Structures are given as structure tokens and as C-alpha cells.
Amino acid sequence: MGDPRRLGKKYDTPNHPWIGERIQKEREISQKYGLVNKKELWKMETQLRNYRRQARKLISDTTTQGGKEAVQLFNVLKRYAILVEQEPTLDHVLSLDIESILERRLQTIVYRKGLAKTAKQARQFIVHGHIAVNGKRVTAPAYLVSVAENDAIEYVPNSPMASENHPERTAAVSEENQ
């Protein structure tokens, strides 16, 4: 029939490819959060850039529609716990950094909860299908976890990792279940 539509890129690359300071910062963030390549980091940076761009647009928009859009933006950011203030303002959105989004990735949360020993191991568990969110297997490490799903992250019941005495399971999880 027809050709499938061409999907656009979900990220913007840096303007200049060889800035040593930026490369060093990206390397540190990639190691801290277990990112495989820079494209993953650039996707999250682009998402943050879009939130900040929307906030800048809404600062100048004083109509009722602008107020509604600001509330919708706050609700999205609160749903994913990217914005944690009780009474958020657009200045809070402008002050967000890349780590506030990276902390909400499934890979990071699995590591922080103690389901994996390292961030890279958390990624492997997710990709291999050992992690479930709300009882559904999720195989995307970049999946943004909402606040409602935060407590529903666990091993898939029929996974070998669900066994208490699996050698790769962390001691923190084994003690928690006893």
C-alpha cells in the first residue's frame, strides 16, 4: 500500500561535537545512570529542553488558556515526580536539570530500590524481561515511572530472579522479603 511515514528524531545533537567539558560531563552522567550511549542522554535533554521551552512560552502568556496549559504542565511533571514542589511555579520548571528526569527512569529506580547491584545490572534485568511494573513486564530501561507506579516495581513472578536464593539477587531484597 503506502510507504510508512518517516518518524522524526526524538533528540537533538549538540551544536558542536568536540567540546571537552561537555563530553566529560556527559561521560560522568552516563556512568552514574548506566546509560549505554549519548543518544539516550540527548533524548532526556531534549525532553527537558521542551519542558523548559513550554515554561518560557507560558511565562509571557497571561491569558486564561496560558494558565490552563501551565497547570497541565505542572500535572505532567508532578505525575512523574520530576517536579516535587507543592505549589510549583514556572520558575521551578526552568530550574529543572537533567538529573531530575534521569532519576525517574525505570533503570535508575530499579537500582535505587536495590533490585540490582549496579545501574548496568538494572538495565540488563529490564532488557532481559525480569522486571515488571504493575504486573506487566517492561523491557525499556528509559521507561519513565510515574509516582503511582513507583511502589509496583518488582521482579516478574515467573522469572528466575523471583527466586529468593538466586545468586544475582541483592541482599537488600532478600532481607526485605523475609
UniProtKB/Swiss-Prot annotation:
Function: One of the primary rRNA binding proteins, it binds directly to 16S rRNA where it nucleates assembly of the body of the 30S subunit.
UniProt-annotated stretches for the region Disordered: 158-178
Keyword Repressor on entry: no
Gene from which this protein is expressed: rps4
Species in which this protein is naturally found: Methanococcus maripaludis (strain C6 / ATCC BAA-1332)
GO molecular function: rRNA binding; structural constituent of ribosome
Start and end residues of each S4 RNA-binding domain: 104-166
GO cellular component terms listed in the entry, alphabetical order: small ribosomal subunit
InterPro entries, sorted: Ribosomal_uS4, Ribosomal_uS4_arc, Ribosomal_uS4_CS, Ribosomal_uS4_euk/arc, Ribosomal_uS4_N, S4_RNA-bd, S4_RNA-bd_sf
Similarity annotation: Belongs to the universal ribosomal protein uS4 family.
NCBIfam families, sorted: PRK04051.1, uS4_arch
Subunit structure: Part of the 30S ribosomal subunit. Contacts protein S5. The interaction surface between S4 and S5 is involved in control of translational fidelity.
Any one GO BP annotation for this protein: translation
Protein name: Small ribosomal subunit protein uS4
Name of a matching Pfam family: S4
Domain of life: Archaea
Signal peptide: none
